[in-house]
């Protein structure tokens, strides 16, 4: 330390802390008067103000480093505090930390400023509300006079709108609205397209007196208006200078599709769509003619057989606006034609039904069926009746999908009789009539049935047909020829349609002498259909002979057999024999018993794959001895479980096990202990230190030379 006569001087070391980060230390020399008893903080600040400016004193808080219980602490200081030097070294160390209340040094903001801003914003909002209300009032006032202005020229409209805008501006100024109006007002000239655009920017409501302006964007505000000298400065986005007159309510052809009392609004696109629809629907259309045309488009009942000429005549009569008397006459003519058509249709249906069924009370013929008979045609067999009794022949039934997809080339009469026995359109005759019924008709009657319908003479009466049917019913026909023909037909059917199911009767039950014939009772659809849509049943069987002796050795070339049976559940394949690893454990007797069991299971008498096994021949399953496999000892007399148990007990007791040498083995090279199996792996890479040193010398000779030098 250097001391003078008037003052003393010391070396002070200080650090500044900005945002929690310390700067590099600075060294200064401070002078202080000797009569004050030591260096004070005021003297240091005075020196710093001279060196670094006035702000450094107010921006930091100062503390000095001092000893405290064999440690160092920082002692906060004020201006009049004496700075104590460190013991031993006698140094003065100061640290300046940035103050937390730095906002107090900023210029003071008066709270009245915020209140002024709030007042100004409230005034702006009030001005906006007043402007918006005034604009709505003006629009409502002008909507009533819009109808009168449409008859005036465009120039007069603009003048009127200019005068109204001036009146509106005067009203706004009287209410305190801030409006900037230039002194030199020019005449306004606006194109008609601009007015239409301004009109379309408003949305129409249901009532004629309510028009609400649409919010405009910045792009919408740019309108092709020329020579506009009137500018209204407002804060509202809904009022743009001129108050555009509201469009008047739409007329009937362009009326929006909503009721007058609702509050629904339509925008510009919806209005254009409605205009397009209305103009398109109402263009050159006579409502009277359209109503007549709509009335003419009526579906004709399917039972009427009126031709195109009748329809055109009726349409021509309807299209001509005739008198009521002529209309009544036309209706009477049409009714007569309909009655005649119904009578002719009903008569034709009866004739066709009698020809179709051959006088039988049940069944109809299979469509698209043809039958070629080598026998000559006879006129007596043309309208042969169908038999109502059971026949001794075989009944052939086919499924619905086969009957619809495959054309039957030669069906027998029994097939037709049974296939169509469910249609009961007439009552079953009593049993006395069934006694006189003969056996089924021959193939000549079958050929007659397949004759075209156009051969029927419509002039024949029903009574004549019934008489012919009774005459034919009294005749009897030979049976042997019918049975032979039937057998040949069945062969043809079985070849062409393999999926047909044939049910053969054991003995004939009808046409016996002295026994009454039984009438057929119609059966349900489920009883008629014998086959289903599922796959056919396939069974594969194996011979019950025992397997060859070499099968258990894995040398058998036979493949496993799968059982395919129709089930509701998904099919699963059942192998005939077990996998080879399991079969090896069987003896020859067990293999033979297993093969006999599989043969019994797969026999055709048993439909299901599962069968009850006898207790004499049980199936033996192989069991793996896991304990014998896992407890194979690593070293003689000691298993894996033994040394794992010893290690676990040692860890629990925190003591080495007594037989530690027997469990873990020590490496002779490095002295580490390993399990017996791990020690062998370790010994492959463990080498003595001399070997490692020599290897490193050969690998890096320059290192050895540097050490030697």
Curated annotation (Swiss-Prot):
UniProt cross-references to InterPro entries, sorted A to Z: SOK, SOK_DIX, Znf_C2HC_C3H
One Pfam family it belongs to: zf-C2HC_2
Recorded superkingdom: Eukaryota
Residue sites binding Zn(2+) per the record: 667, 670, 682, 686
Comp. bias (Polar residues): 529-544
Stretches the record annotates as Disordered: 242-266, 315-344, 358-393, 411-439, 506-560
Gene Ontology CC entries for this record: plasma membrane
Keyword check for Cell division: yes
Keyword terms of this UniProt record: Cell cycle, Cell division, Cell membrane, Developmental protein, Membrane, Metal-binding, Zinc, Zinc-finger
Subunit: Homodimer. Forms long polymer filaments with other SOKs proteins polymers crucial for polar localization and biological activity.
Stated role: SOSEKI proteins locally interpret global polarity cues and can influence cell division orientation to coordinate cell polarization relative to body axes.
Domain notes: The DIX-like oligomerization domain is required for polymerization, edge localization and biological activity.
Note: 'Soseki' means cornerstone in Japanese.
PANTHER family given in the database record: PROTEIN SOSEKI 3 (PTHR31083:SF6), UPSTREAM OF FLC PROTEIN (DUF966) (PTHR31083)
Protein name, per record: Protein SOSEKI 3
Gene responsible for this protein: SOK3
